[in-house]
Amino acid sequence: MTAEGAFPLGAATTTIMIIRGINPIFATLGGFVAGMLAGAVSGFMHTKMKIPALLTGIITLTGLYSVNLLVLGSANVSLSGHNTLVTMVTGLGLSKLNGVILLGLIFVSLVVFMLVVLLNTQVGLALRATGDNLAMGEANGIKVDRMKILGYMISNGLIALSGALLAQNNGYADMNMGTGTIVNGLAAIILAEVIVKYLPLGKRLWSIVVGAVLYRLVLVIILAMNVDAQMLKLASAILLAIILYVPEVRQKLKIRPNKSLTPGGDK
């Protein structure tokens, strides 16, 4: 749940920093850091205060609404007339579409590269072990509480970074930008798992990117079918339910090996 508060937090922080004359690159990093701080708060409440994860997310989301409003000063703030990453790229002669695609590829490539490097270090392996099997990680001497907090910080930092980039693409920051962030993220991950499985870490991260693009593409197709925009959330929910059900269908339709071809089978 923290994700839906961290997303607009990154957008709000970056927008205000840009308006105050800070370089868009540093402003974008500022949004990332703000998200990490929000994640640290969630991680602290969950690990040290022993508040359940779901309640932690709800509490942080509720608090971040006021924080975001305090940062922005109003429900939405425009970046019109200010220099952003998008205007910097379009200033090189690229169209806005090509510039946004270029920025997206650059940031996605950097994030994937840095995550692959991090998750293959000793700290990264401890982080992965904590996520895969908490009890086993703790039994092997891993300080799981620290790893949880680190995981909260990294994930919410990246979510806030996404909000910072979207604000610069749209030209404004809005209090409600984070609505649906969790659904979109889950859909991208699950769709990637449905399409391909058992990939190395780097390729798995890229498959999630592809899943996110495919999910948004399907939503665009739904809108192109003259579906009422008010029904888009319902369509998203139905689509997510279908995506979640696909693995179950595949399991039911899975063809079992012929007994005659298995060791000990009839000849």
Language-model-derived ranges and their functions:
Residues 34, 57-85, 111, 156-174, ...:
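Alpha-helical transmembrane segments in inner-membrane proteins
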Residues 1-21, 28, 44-49, 190-197, ...:
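Single transmembrane alpha-helix segments in multi-pass membrane proteins
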Residues 132-139, 143-146, 203, 218-267:
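Cytosolic-side transmembrane-helix boundaries in multi-pass membrane proteins
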Residues 53, 57, 64-120, 150, ...:
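Transmembrane helix-bundle core of multi-pass membrane transporters
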Residues 23, 38, 96-178, 182, ...:
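Helix-loop-helix "hairpin" substructures at the membrane interface of multi-pass membrane proteins
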